[in-house]
Amino acid sequence: MKITFYGHASLAIEVGGKHIIVDPFITGNPQAAAIDINTLKADYILLTHAHGDHVLDVETIAKNTNAVIVSNAEITSYYAKKGFNSHPMNHGGSWKFDFGKVKYVNAIHSSSFPDGTYGGNPGGFVIEGEHKNIYIAGDTALTYDMKLIPLRTKLDLAILPIGNNFTMDVEDAIIASDFIECDKILGYHFDTFGYIEINHEESIKKFFDKGKDLMLLAIGESIEL
């Protein structure tokens, strides 16, 4: 399983011979100017919620690739009405795709499209593929619901927001890593705007002091599990 960071909360995942894009917000992020969305491969586009900084480039990528949009029922209905392929899910449900299993789990946030359309309840994803398990939290506060995840799944990596203001901060993300019983964390949703700027060295040290590994990738950088 290969995971590439495209800035903010945008990710690419290669697993089971398939290409997945998560929450594409690339053209609106000056820090990701080197990423050409017209060259991205996508069999699936996973969306945690409907905010503009998570869905800006969905339609362009979906048109280019004919990817299947996977999200909650409200978000997939929104795109299905526009003619896009979609697979609806909802909280607590899972589905076996051709690359692995996806479960849609709870997040505490808000969710509406830039045009005001209701975007359903926000969520996150637990993905199981190639004998590796990851958790993509989406935009969320710290929540006791996270404690449910390790009851069913032993995680190899968790991708957690750490920018504060709109989501958890670093301290809450450390507690979240305890809840999900995963000490290998990829941080995201930071530094894109002034509201969510972080001190990288301090953040990494705070995790290290708790015996945990916080990775902060450069845009375009990848890790493999």
Swiss-Prot record:
Q: Does the keyword Hydrolase apply?
A: yes
Keyword set includes Signal: no
**Record keywords, A-Z:** Hydrolase
The record, for Gene3D superfamilies, names:
Ribonuclease Z/Hydroxyacylglutathione hydrolase-like
Q: Which SUPFAM superfamilies match?
A: Metallo-hydrolase/oxidoreductase
Q: Which domain of life is it from?
A: Bacteria
UniProt xrefs under SMART domains: Lactamase_B (SM00849)
Sample GO molecular function, one term: hydrolase activity
Q: Which Pfam families does the protein's record reference?
A: Lactamase_B_3
Family, similarity comment: Belongs to the UPF0173 family.
Q: Which PANTHER family match?
A: UPF0173 METAL-DEPENDENT HYDROLASE MJ1163 (PTHR43546:SF3), UPF0173 METAL-DEPENDENT HYDROLASE MJ1163-RELATED (PTHR43546)
Q: State the name under which the record lists this protein.
A: UPF0173 metal-dependent hydrolase Fjoh_2786
